[in-house]
Regions:
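Short acidic-glycine-tyrosine-enriched beta hairpin
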Residues: 22, 57-89
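Conserved hydrophobic/aromatic beta-strand scaffold that supports enzyme active sites
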Residues: 15-17, 28-32, 49, 67, ...
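Histidine-centered active-site/metal-ligand motif
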Residues: 42-44, 84-85
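A short hydrophobic beta-strand segment most commonly corresponding to one strand
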Residues: 49, 77, 90-107
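"Short basic amphipathic alpha-helical interaction patches in structured regions
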Residues: 32, 44, 65-74, 111-113
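A short, N-terminal "cap"/entry segment at the start of jelly-roll beta-barrel domains
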Residues: 1-25, 67, 111-129
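Glycine- and acidic-residue-biased ligand/ion/polar-headgroup-sensing regions
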Residues: 34-35, 44-63
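Short, charged/polar surface micro-motifs in flexible loops or helix N-caps
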Residues: 23-25, 35-37, 56, 82, ...
Length: 129
């Protein structure tokens, strides 16, 4: 496990890159998310599939605020252009996800902070191990 970049998350999220597929523009990782941690605002440029292995994940504010809450064990799908202002983990959580295409982390005015492709994920992983 290595730390996920703090510029793109809060609360000590860790990750492991499991696979990259340059021919598909895809990358797969598993994430360890402590209680109270979150990912910064982002847009799924391409679709993604995940499986929660432990805990809970609140997307778009969670069910109580009109969003979704994923509970382990459980499968989820993110369509193209899905926007998440904040993805929050109210308890210790872990999930496996495949991203088909880039993940666009955005700032407060919608500007791109980081566009994470399979190559960027691979470079970040290799630099951290």
């Amino acid at each position: 496990w290595v730390d996920f970049p703090e510029a793109l998350s809060e609360g000590g999220i860790r990750w492991k890159l499991l696979n990259v597929s340059p021919e598909m523009g895809a990358w797969t990782a598993i994430f360890d998310c402590p209680a109270g941690s979150s990912f910064a605002s982002h847009v799924h440029i391409g679709p993604g599939e995940y499986f929660m292995t432990k805990g809970r994940m609140e997307v778009r504010g969670g069910e109580d605020d009109g969003g979704d809450t994923a509970v382990a064990p459980g499968y989820g799908y993110e369509p193209c252009q899905a926007y998440h202002e904040k993805t929050f983990f109210p308890e210790n959580s872990e999930f496996y996800m495949t991203f088909l295409g880039p993940l666009n982390f955005t700032g407060p005015n919608g500007e791109t902070v980081a566009l994470v492709t399979w190559a960027d994920a691979q470079a970040a992983w290799e630099a951290s191990i």
